From Swiss-Prot:
It comes from Thermoanaerobacter sp. (strain X514). Belongs to the NAD-dependent DNA ligase family. LigA subfamily. This is DNA ligase. The active site is at residue 111. Residues 581-662 form the BRCT domain. It holds the Pfam family HHH_5. GO terms for molecular function: DNA binding; DNA ligase (NAD+) activity; metal ion binding. DNA ligase that catalyzes the formation of phosphodiester linkages between 5'-phosphoryl and 3'-hydroxyl groups in double-stranded DNA using NAD as a coenzyme and as the energy source for the reaction. It is essential for DNA replication and repair of damaged DNA.
Length: 662
């Protein structure tokens, strides 16, 4: 068969099966058969690149990472909806509508708790997708939206239209994603809506493609060459074109039927596989919508009814303290199990010790618990009239319950944090940070390998990395002879890193790379840093009382001193390497870097400037002398041009390093 014809046939087959699987949930072929069709299409398109088109289903896998999202002005403003929280407010809305246009039919729909987007199709082909933004201008996230398989890349008809929909993440996918993030020591998403928003706004579409996002289309914003009388007709048309439309859209003759349907949706809420935060009421007649019009913020023909967060009464059986991956100690209430929003709740967050004091929460109290989309519900109120006198006050520990290290609460902060390098709760994240590029830069030591090392008991702290042997690493998954030797060489090479890189790698709370440089430059050795007192640190530039307290508390912890000693015994450098200034050619000069540099990393360019007496800052101001511009610069370039700051490229920078054209 002619390649062009075969590609056309494969696209039609894949689009058909995508629709059966992702929209109708009625697959006709196995995953393997589908994968074979997709593989053949990709191979043919690679062989004949001139036949590749933007609407091909092969384009869903995700393109190249973006530097930033481009702003996009919506074809039709994406207005928000006015809210109603009671039956009375719904009846007020109905009265206003009927006063303006007479009796009306309404449509009641689910209000999906996700991220609103606009999709534009030209002659049946998906061309642009954007987030809501401020309602007038959003962000162009077309490449990311193409990875959502329930969004058709080509419609049934060659029609030009604009639709609005809600991108969301099903609860099961959300739970799976958080499980994976927890294993990698990454921060958890608070709820499916946050996960959906974070996933859609990834600069790398390949990340979005892995996140299992879905969409429901709920409104036809604009269409060329066709007319419809009602909202229901538009939904039926969109369904025929291949869109996954909002699953519940009930036509109601009057406000009483609307209120009844909203209550039915409330009862259904917990059984749905995705989150909703209410119901939307819309006028069905499109001509009457035109008459009703809109305010600057919202249409007069629609309103959102928001369900209140469900609250239940239960008892606090105990209060325990959990340690997060950043070392934060969080008090958690152990509750008498109670059913809320479709799940049995047996624990609730108490946030921090101030929250407990403010609410006067005690062990044994009867409390009101609320679940409002968070992973863990929260205690919102104490029923003090039910106290018996047997309740016990809770005292926040000053030692970490996981490792016994000192738990420090810095002045002005609500959170108490563990200072222990050995703390199992924060070990994965701590080692990932220690091995990162700006710290010890151990090439090849990523989260997956660190996870294996920890789970097999081969390491228990950062110092153990320097005692790993060939036979330890060769047993790990995906580690062959060459990769083991490369990793051992990378670990060995990291021993020579400068003192500030090691200090930053320890992950001391509030001590970033810049502060680590200031401290290392002043004290010269790790021993001097460990012996220094609070006031010794506060005298340094850019080191405030909180940072000083944090670093003093860190080195007051015995287990941390032992790990430093272990690092020292392994041969890790503990001194500020005396590089000295290469020259003073940039003395008194301030630089700003913007865009991706080709010849060096930002860190390398920064060091080159500082070694020659210059200073690097993050923002452009009148005090800036030079802006070094790389590929795809951001807004800093524009500001530099407006202020008349000298702009240099890498070639000019290299000439300046030689002492030329300064």
């Amino acid at each position: 068969m002619d390649p062009k014809e075969r590609i056309k046939e494969l696209r039609e087959k894949i689009n058909y099966h995508n629709y059966r699987y992702y929209v109708l949930d009625q697959p006709e072929i196995s995953d393997y058969e589908y994968d074979m069709l997709m593989r053949e299409l990709i191979e043919l398109e690679e062989k004949y690149p001139e036949l590749k088109t933007p609407d091909s289903p092969s384009q869903r896998v995700g393109g190249e990472p973006l530097k930033e999202f481009e702003p996009f002005t919506h074809v039709v403003p994406m207005l928000s909806l006015a809210n109603a929280f009671s039956e009375g407010e719904l009846r007020d809305f109905d009265r206003r509508v009927r006063e303006a246009v007479g009796d009306v039919e309404y449509v009641v729909e689910l209000k999906i708790d996700g991220l609103s987007v606009e999709l534009i199709y030209e002659k049946g082909i998906f061309t642009v997708g954007s987030t809501r933004g401020d309602g007038i201008v959003g962000e162009n996230v077309t490449q990311n939206l193409k990875t959502i398989k329930s969004i058709p890349l080509r419609l049934k008809d060659d029609v030009s239209l604009v639709v609005r929909g809600e991108v969301f993440m099903p609860r099961a996918s959300f739970e799976k994603l958080n499980e994976e993030r927890e294993k990698l020591g990454e921060s958890l998403f608070a709820n499916p809506r946050n996960a959906a928003a974070g996933s859609l706004r990834q600069l790398d579409p390949k990340v979005t493609a892995k996140r299992d996002l879905d969409i429901f289309i709920f409104n036809l914003q604009k269409i060329e060459g066709r007319k419809f009388k009602t909202h229901i007709e538009t939904l039926e048309f969109l369904n025929e074109q291949g869109f996954k439309i909002i699953p519940i859209h009930k036509k109601c003759s009057n406000i009483d039927e609307v209120i009844k349907e909203i209550e039915e949706i409330r009862n259904l809420r917990d059984k749905l596989p995705y989150d909703i935060d209410g119901a939307v009421v819309k006028v069905n007649d499109l001509e009457k919508r035109e008459i009703l019009g809109q305010t600057a913020k919202d249409p007069r023909w629609a309103i959102a009814f928001k369900y209140p967060a469900e609250r239940k009464k239960t008892k606090v059986l105990d209060i325990i303290v959990q340690v997060g991956r950043t070392g934060a100690l969080t008090p958690t209430a152990i509750l008498e199990p109670v059913a809320i929003s479709g799940s049995v709740v047996s624990r609730a967050t108490l946030h921090n010790e101030d929250y407990i004091k403010e609410k006067d929460i005690r062990i044994g109290d009867t409390v009101i618990v609320q679940k409002a989309g968070e992973i863990i519900p929260e205690v919102v109120e104490v029923v003090k009239e039910e106290r018996t006198g047997q309740e016990r006050e809770f005292v926040m520990p000053d030692r970490c319950p996981e490792c016994g290290a000192l738990a420090v609460r810095l002045l002005g902060e609500a959170i108490r944090r563990c200072t222990g390098l050995n703390c199992p709760a924060q070990l994965l994240r701590g080692i990932i940070h220690f091995a990162s590029k700006d710290a010890m830069d151990i090439e090849g030591l990523g989260p997956a390998i660190i996870n294996q090392l920890l789970s097999k008991g081969l390491i228990h702290n950062i110092a153990d990395l320097y005692y790993l042997k060939y036979e330890d690493l060769i047993q790990l998954e995906r580690m062959g002879d060459k990769s083991v030797k490369n990793l051992l060489n990378a670990i060995e090479e990291s021993k020579t890193r400068d003192l500030d890189r090691l200090l930053f790698g320890l992950g001391i709370n509030l001590i970033g790379s810049k502060a680590a440089q200031v401290i290392a430059e002043h004290f010269k050795t790790m021993d001097n840093i460990m012996k220094a007192k609070f006031e010794d640190f506060t005298q340094l530039p850019d080191i405030g009382p909180k940072m000083a307290r944090s670093i003093v508390s860190f080195f007051a912890e015995k287990q941390n001193v032992e790990i430093i000693e272990k690092l020292k015994n392994a041969g890790v450098n503990m001194k500020k390497l005396s590089k000295g200034k290469v020259s003073n050619i940039f003395e008194g000069k301030t630089f700003v870097l913007t865009g991706a540099l080709e010849s060096y990393t930002r860190e390398e360019a920064t060091r080159m400037i500082e070694e020659r007496g210059g200073k690097v800052t993050n923002s452009v101001s009148k005090k800036t002398d030079y802006v070094l511009v790389g590929k795809d610069p951001g807004s800093k370039l524009k500001k530099a041009q407006e202020l008349g700051i000298k702009i240099i490229d890498e070639k000019q920078f290299e000439e300046m390093l030689k002492g030329e054209n300064i």
